[in-house]
Amino acid sequence: MHFVAVYILTHFHAYPGVAALPFFSTLPKITSCCDHYVVLNSLSSVSSSTPTCLDGEXLFQNAGQKFCRPFTDNRTIVYTMQDQVQRPWSVTWMDFNLVISDYGRAVIENLTESAMSAHKNGPRYLQMETFISDLFRYECHRDNRYVLEKKLQMFYPTTHMNELLFYPSDPTLPSPYGNGHY
């Protein structure tokens, strides 16, 4: 089944209302289960915690590899991107923690029709199962956390000539894929 990567990025903090984050921003916190939980937060720090998935939190298993549902908290990181070249409009994206949840999938499905009908050059489709599998597979290479950021760049293109929403937290680092391969 294909889903649309449509994304509103709102940022809920102690203040009321929604604030748009800058276009060049760091990645939101992502937690997954490899040999143990791996956390990539907005400070680009990696840490580990419990060695196994929490009960009921396993998404699926593949060749002995267990994939856990990422932890979520009461903060939702949202980004709003405007196309300043043509007519301005917001590209709606799902926060990763919501994307792989049942709730997130339902939201994406509901957004698909409205997004595609509102913009003739609507957002791209992606296969969520492949997205999740590849994302976790690359995230498990914990010795280079920037691979995850590059992976998000590949799977979260905007509708404007593959312009990327997410940028590496340290753009001076070489690409883990080498020679500009995304």
UniProtKB/Swiss-Prot annotation:
UniProtKB keywords: Glycoprotein, Late protein, Membrane, Signal, Virion
Q: Which GO terms describe its cellular component?
A: host cell endoplasmic reticulum-Golgi intermediate compartment; membrane; virion membrane
Localized where? Virion membrane; Host endoplasmic reticulum-Golgi intermediate compartment
Glycosylated residues: list them. Answer: N74, N110
Q: What is its main location?
A: virion
Share the record's PTM remark: Glycosylated by host.
Q: Which domain of life is it from?
A: Viruses
Q: Which residues form the signal peptide?
A: 1-20
Q: How does it assemble?
A: Interacts with isoform gQ2. The heterodimer gQ1-gQ2 associates with the glycoprotein complex gH-gL to form a tetrameric complex. The gH/gL/gQ1/gQ2 complex binds to host TNFRSF4.
What function does the entry list? Plays a role in virus entry by participating in host receptor binding at the cell surface.
Under what name is this protein listed? Glycoprotein Q2
Write down the species: Human herpesvirus 6B (strain Z29) (HHV-6 variant B)
